[in-house]
Structures are given as C-alpha cells and as structure tokens.
C-alpha cells in the first residue's frame, strides 16, 4: 500500500484513504489488525467518483455490494451450484457460502478469474491481478471444480437438488434451453 510506504519512510505522519474505504468498508480495521491480504483491493478506476460527482448512487467496480456490505444468514439452507468462475461467479459463490449455503462452483477453464485474467495484461492494469487473488481467497469452504463444464446430465443427476446460478456470458455461446 502506498500509504504504508509513505508513513514507514517518514514522508508523512498520516494518510487520508478515500476510495479504498468504499471498496472495503472494513479497510481501516483490517489494516490495523495486519490483515492486509483480507482487504478487498481498490483498482483506482474511479467508478465511485462518478456517483459522487453527479449526485448519483455510489457504485464500485470491485465491490458490487458497496454501502450494502451486511450479508444475512439465509433462513433456509440450500445447495447452490454456481456455473462460471469469473468475477460474478466468484462473488455469487462467496455470498451464497457466507449466507450458509452449501456451494459448488464449476468453471470450464483451468483457472478462476474469467476475463479479469485478460484485463490485467496491458501495462498499468496489473492491479487487477490483486482482485482475482482476493476473490479466490474468499472461496474458503466452496467446492471449486476447475476444468468442469456443467452439462444437462450433471444437472439432472448430481445437481438435481441444487439451486443454480449461471454467471457465464463474456464469451457468447448458444445455450440449449433446459426443460
């Protein structure tokens, strides 16, 4: 963290942190406790500033639940299948697990992250790798299955008692309707 380095090197005595507090409302508490790896990373995209500047609701590219961080336990525990291991799939799996559900996350490729793995390649975009790393770290207790394409047969057999969340879509594909 830049603030950490500035204070450690005697450049300043304190730093004001703005956008990262929107990205992770527990930023200060986690930093104070030394839990730096648990902080949801801000990528400095400025999306939050758009809402502030134009009097609109604040939103965050990295934290879809900004200003709504409390996750209540589900009144009824369910089995949940999340199809797709991109950012939406990882967030859906995290929230479902946090609510107390039994969660399986299936990703057809050999790694999680989806299009974020490509988005972090251009010069100046390496911060995005921190988002993927953070999101992966939040999947403790989730049954993550890589190299797994969910088929109709799997849904009819192994996952017949599951609620299904489909989070695919960055690569257009024809999907056969399920009846």
Language model features by range: what are they?
Residues 1-83, 87-103, 111, 171-179:
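Flavin-dependent oxidoreductase catalytic cores
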Residues 4-14, 26, 126, 136, ...:
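C-terminal structured "cap/appendage" subdomains that terminate the fold
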Residues 6-9, 29-32, 118-122, 126, ...:
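Short low-complexity, flexible loop/linker segments enriched in glycine and/or proline
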Residues 17, 146, 166-167:
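General beta-strand structural signal in soluble alpha/beta enzymes
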Residues 76-80, 147, 161:
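Phosphate-coordination loops involved in phosphoryl transfer and adenosine-cofactor binding
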Residues 81-146, 179:
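Beta1-alpha1 glycine-rich phosphate/pyrophosphate-binding loop at the start
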Residues 162-163, 167-174:
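Glycine-/small-residue-rich beta->alpha transition segments that form the dinucleotide
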């Amino acid at each position: 963290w830049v603030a950490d380095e500035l204070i450690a090197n005697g450049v300043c005595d304190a730093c004001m942190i703005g956008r990262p507090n929107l990205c992770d409302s527990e930023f200060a508490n986690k930093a104070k406790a030394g839990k730096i790896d648990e902080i949801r990373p801000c990528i400095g995209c400025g999306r939050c500033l758009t809402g502030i500047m134009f009097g609109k609701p604040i939103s965050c590219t990295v934290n879809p639940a900004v200003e709504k961080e409390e996750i209540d336990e589900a009144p009824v525990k369910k089995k949940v299948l999340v199809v797709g291991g991109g950012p939406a799939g990882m967030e859906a799996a995290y929230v479902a697990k946090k609510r107390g559900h039994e969660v399986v996350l299936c990703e057809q490729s050999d790694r999680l992250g989806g299009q974020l793995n490509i988005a972090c390649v251009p010069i100046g975009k390496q911060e995005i790798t921190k988002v993927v790393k953070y999101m992966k770290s939040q999947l403790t207790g989730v049954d993550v299955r890589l190299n797994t394409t969910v088929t109709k047969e799997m849904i009819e057999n192994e996952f017949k008692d599951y609620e299904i969340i489909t989070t695919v879509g960055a690569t257009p594909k024809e999907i056969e309707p399920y009846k």
